Amino acid sequence: MYHLNQKALLLFSGGQDSGTCLGWALSNFSHIITIGFSYGQRHSVEMQCRTNIRNKISKLSKIWEQRLGEDYIFSLDIFSQLGETAITSELEIVFDKQGLPNTFVPGRNIFFLTIAAAFAWRNSIRHLIIGTCETDFSGYPDCQDNSIKATQLALSLGLGEDITIHTPLMWLTKAQTWELALHLGGSKFVDLIRNETHSCYLNDHTTSHEWGYGCGTCPACKLRKNGWETFLMKKRAN
């Protein structure tokens, strides 16, 4: 899939998934604008990581440097007003009877995509990129393929333009996401993802591990760690 004569807008949080998607976007589109959201997230350090990732990824490739465009951040304080979650307040992370963790922020990706699409429309951009995936441990409803497709249809109808939402990680495991990073930018890009992106729900970006920074115990850290270890095993086997 290549759209090298097209612009695209990437929803960029500073995490592993959106960081990997940045490499994918720069490999597939001629101009990439990034957009981030400050919504009172507990792991606010990821917002600081965004700048470091953007600065360092442009040094990995002249082509990527030429294609990387502007960055925008929007404030969405409304989520904390809608109710507490373990992402927007200091709650202990627990799971309900259906296995859904209280890190789920209801409607978050729908909000994000709606704002991104409105911004894209004003800038004549018809391609959005988001790092959602169904294989993520969480089972967040708004990360699932049918939810993204429904949102794409609603936005296209509501804006009167065909909007395409790209989800390059939708069917990938975390190990496969590490593999994609290696394929896109080699070991230097893997190192950038490992050292500069942030996943930890508890906002720990000081404790270092082989797979990156984090507390090592929250669900996001465990998922990242397990994916890294599986990735290394497959890499060594080959």
Swiss-Prot record:
Cofactor(s) in the UniProt record: Zn(2+)
Pfam families assigned to the protein according to its UniProt record, in alphabetical order: QueC
Pathway(s) per entry: Purine metabolism; 7-cyano-7-deazaguanine biosynthesis
EC number in record: 6.3.4.20
Cofactor comment: Binds 1 zinc ion per subunit.
Parts forming coiled coils: none
GO biological process, alphabetically ordered: queuosine biosynthetic process
InterPro entries associated with the record: QueC (IPR018317), Rossmann-like_a/b/a_fold (IPR014729)
CDD domains documented for this protein: QueC-like (cd01995)
Keyword line: ATP-binding, Ligase, Metal-binding, Nucleotide-binding, Queuosine biosynthesis, Zinc
Annotated binding of Zn(2+), by residue: C200, C215, C218, C221
Reactions catalysed, as given in the entry: 7-carboxy-7-deazaguanine + NH4(+) + ATP = 7-cyano-7-deazaguanine + ADP + phosphate + H2O + H(+)
Residues annotated to bind ATP: F12, S13, G14, G15, Q16, D17, S18, G19, T20, C21, L22
Top-level enzyme category: ligase
An annotated Gene Ontology molecular function: zinc ion binding
Highest taxon in the source lineage: Bacteria
HAMAP family: QueC
Protein role: Catalyzes the ATP-dependent conversion of 7-carboxy-7-deazaguanine (CDG) to 7-cyano-7-deazaguanine (preQ(0)).
Family to which the UniProt record says this protein belongs: Belongs to the QueC family.
NCBIfam families (alphabetical): 7-cyano-7-deazaguanine synthase QueC
Name under which the protein is recorded: 7-cyano-7-deazaguanine synthase
Species in which this protein is naturally found: Lawsonia intracellularis (strain PHE/MN1-00)
Gene: queC
